[in-house]
Design a protein with these regions (language model features):
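Pseudouridine synthases involved in rRNA/tRNA modification
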Residues: 2-7, 37-42, 46-127, 136, ...
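RNA pseudouridine synthases
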Residues: 49, 54-63, 131, 184-195, ...
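A generic structural signal for ordered alpha-helices
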Residues: 90, 101, 167-173, 194, ...
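Eukaryotic helix-linker segments that join adjacent hydrophobic helices
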Residues: 126-137, 147-204, 208-211, 232
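Amphipathic alpha-helical scaffolds
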Residues: 140-143
Length: 477
């Protein structure tokens, strides 16, 4: 089987897929000064899958950012032309993920440039951001793949083809399909290699607004404690490891070796995060978390009061947001426990403060007062505090994902198929109810919500750190 035959079919899919849904890059700034330019005059032979990611487009509301998009200029036919990833745009571009099967070996940067008509500097930026992945063998296509895509996948992964590739000898197909990040522009990719290119990585403009040195709580030989700002990622995303707390804190401290992530808090959450200075301490801290030697306290600003005491739910074991929780035990679902230690009435944040932190209005009916709760997190599930409080009818202020569902359940008790007033009678009714309930949730917050990791301690308090006052207190008298 010749790789070219697969290429033709996949290029056809590309032209009928992505380019029919979104603007192609039909022309771009000539890079005559680049030594790589000669490579892009050749006809592309690459096999190309293309898709638009189903993830939601998230826009930043930070008005102070330079409004420069990733696609900064426009050609005569209205299509965008790519330039550089910096300066950071104030808005994320439309999702675009490209899937390639390499037909001719060579440096990865050159191959992506000629296959996708992208400028070398832009592709180099993507690689630096961690937005390009490879696998020795093309992974299994998703259920949504077309018959033509399935056919081509079978062609390039046929045993007769794979048996001729020395790079995968001794590996199972599953092992060879594992994806790894491309780390260098000159990295060689052989024919048959699969590439995934996140052309529009998720951006974090807030990283460029923060005085990172002022957010450092402690520096030791083994770790750094950071007061993470809301609207930032602790260790980066699958398509952007550059715009992260670990990267910017490392630079602020002048470290030559980047800090390492030991645990996560949501992008929209602020507060204490421990970053390891060495791989050894990263492993040590992970062990402390597993052994439950790390204690985390949160401050949550809720729209309704929360009862003092331990709250227990069970979280659906599906790694997709929003996270659904049940009051009743369900086999296979994850136990979620938190302890509400305090709950006091406070003023609802004033409009100026809300605007400063891009707090989204999810139309909670009463905004006269809010409630500040101190919470001891007893289990550490993704979105746990947000999901549990919303399930109690006390969503977090600004939580545009979970508050709409809480409002819907409050207005029409029984919509939540896992709540007190569930109404379904059969399993088929339940499936339909779950689907409808899932649709009641909103989008992920753009910057901040009323949630702070206010304290972190371990080894029975031998190491104890506190964050600064949460954002919502800055407007209080």
């Amino acid at each position: 089987m010749k790789m070219g035959s697969a290429s033709a079919g996949l290029v056809s899919i590309f032209s009928n897929g992505y380019r029919s849904l979104s603007a192609p890059v039909s022309s771009w700034r000539t890079l005559a000064s680049s030594s790589l330019y000669k490579h892009y005059k050749r006809n592309s032979k690459s096999a190309v899958f293309s898709c638009l990611s189903s993830s939601k487009i998230e826009l930043s509301c930070l008005s102070s950012k330079v409004d420069v998009a990733q696609t900064t200029t426009t050609s005569v036919n209205g299509y965008h032309k790519y330039d550089r990833l910096l300066p950071c745009p104030s808005e994320n571009g439309p999702p675009r993920v490209e899937h390639l099967v390499v037909s001719e070996g060579g440096p990865v940067l050159e191959y992506i440039c000629k296959s996708l008509d992208l400028p070398p500097l832009f592709v180099a930026d993507l690689i630096h951001f961690g937005a390009v992945y490879y696998a020795l063998v093309c992974p299994q296509p998703p259920p949504s793949a077309t018959p033509e895509q399935i056919r081509i996948f079978k062609e390039v992964t046929a045993p007769s083809v794979l048996s001729k590739r020395t790079s995968i000898k001794g590996k199972t197909v599953r092992e060879a399909q594992k994806t790894f990040r491309i780390t260098h522009v000159e990295q060689f990719v052989e024919a048959g290699t699969y590439l995934r290119v996140h052309v529009h990585p998720k951006r974090f403009p807030r990283c460029y607004e923060i005085d990172w040195k002022s957010r450092i709580i402690a520096v030791t030989d083994s770790y750094v404690v950071l007061d993470k700002p809301a609207g930032t990622s602790v260790g980066g995303t699958s398509d952007n490891i550059e715009e992260s707390c670990a990267t910017f804190a490392s630079r602020a401290l002048g470290f030559s070796t980047p800090l390492k992530t030991t645990h996560q808090i949501d992008n929209c959450t602020e507060g204490c995060v421990v970053l390891a200075r060495t791989k050894e301490y990263c492993s040590i801290f992970h062990g402390k978390i597993r052994e439950k030697k790390v204690k985390k306290l949160y401050l949550a600003l809720t729209a309704a009061p929360v009862p003092i005491g331990i709250i227990t739910h069970y979280m659906r074991p599906i790694n997709v947001a929003p996270r659904l929780v049940s009051e009743d035990f369900i086999k296979g679902w994850y136990l979620c426990k938190l302890e509400v230690m305090e709950c006091k009435e406070v003023p609802w944040p004033d409009p100026v403060i809300q605007q400063k932190y891009c707090i989204e209005d999810s139309e909670w009916p009463s905004k006269d007062r809010a409630y500040e709760c101190k919470i001891n997190l007893l289990t550490g599930r993704t979105h746990q505090v947000r999901a549990q409080l919303a399930a109690c009818g006390a969503p977090i202020v600004g939580d545009s994902m979970y508050m709409p569902a809480a409002i819907a359940e409050m207005a029409n008790p029984g919509l939540n198929p896992f709540g007190k007033y569930k109404k379904y009678t059969t399993e088929s009714d339940k499936e339909m109810t779950v689907t409808k309930w899932f649709a009641r949730f909103g989008k992920e917050p753009k910057v901040a919500i009323g949630l702070q990791a206010c304290e972190i301690s371990w080894d029975d308090g031998e190491h104890f750190y506190e964050a600064r006052s949460p954002w919502w207190r800055s407007g209080m008298a």
